[in-house]
Amino acid sequence: MVRRFKPAVKYRRGSRTHGWGRVGQHRKSGSSGGKGMVGFHKHKWSLVMKYGESGTGWPFYGKHGFKQPPTIAIEWRPINVGSLSDIIKELKKEGKIAEEGGKYVIRLLELGYNKLLGGGHIDVPVIVYTPAASRTAVEKIEKAGGEVRIIPLIHK
């Protein structure tokens, strides 16, 4: 398609400053009032009034929240119901799970997991000992004839 006007860059070729006045008037952070959060209590106060919560200046001023110490935070290592179903035979061969009353007994902490999620399908009845499980995971295991037993998570 034919253009009616030259693109702005081509139109400005040879003009040195492309319509921004003296050299340096469209450079660095001085042309925008400073870098980052600079000036929010001075010349950019109108932005605080427009975008901040009324009266508090949030999120421009003050400290917000806290950083949880890594020693307190729990690192969740989840496994889906479908993945568990896939590895049951391998775990039985390796002797990592037992069988009790026609159901496999699986202790997730011993396998390196601490949460059971509900992705996938399971058709084998199992008894799963885990510190945490999602609602859908519990429903799927109970539907297959098994049960989920919640155990306390000992966190160091």
From Swiss-Prot:
GO terms for cellular component: cytosolic large ribosomal subunit. Keywords: Ribonucleoprotein, Ribosomal protein, RNA-binding, rRNA-binding. Transmembrane segments: none annotated. Pfam families: Ribosomal_L27A (PF00828). Residues 14-35 are annotated as: Disordered. InterPro entries: Rbsml_uL15_N, Ribosomal_uL15, Ribosomal_uL15/eL18, Ribosomal_uL15/eL18_sf, Ribosomal_uL15_CS. GO terms for molecular function: rRNA binding; structural constituent of ribosome. Gene3D superfamilies: 3.100.10.10, 4.10.990.10. It comes from the Archaea. GO terms for biological process: translation. Binds to the 23S rRNA. Belongs to the universal ribosomal protein uL15 family. Part of the 50S ribosomal subunit. This is Large ribosomal subunit protein uL15. It comes from Pyrobaculum islandicum (strain DSM 4184 / JCM 9189 / GEO3). The lineage of its organism: Archaea, Thermoproteota, Thermoprotei, Thermoproteales, Thermoproteaceae.
